[in-house]
């Protein structure tokens, strides 16, 4: 039987907390920051917990959750 592997791209983008929550960064902040407002750039900083509906989908891609 083939070993099931975790999605390596997803492993680099998500951090798993001690209580099995998934943290992710915001989208839309790689470039073109000058055209966005200061408020937009400030709100895109930091990390956010993954939504519960997405958690079920992501759980299948990461083994060991």
Swiss-Prot record:
GO terms for biological process: translation. Keywords: Ribonucleoprotein, Ribosomal protein. GO terms for cellular component: cytosolic large ribosomal subunit. The keyword DNA repair does not apply. GO terms for molecular function: structural constituent of ribosome. Gene3D superfamilies: 4.10.410.60. SUPFAM superfamilies: L35p-like. Belongs to the bacterial ribosomal protein bL35 family. This is Large ribosomal subunit protein bL35.
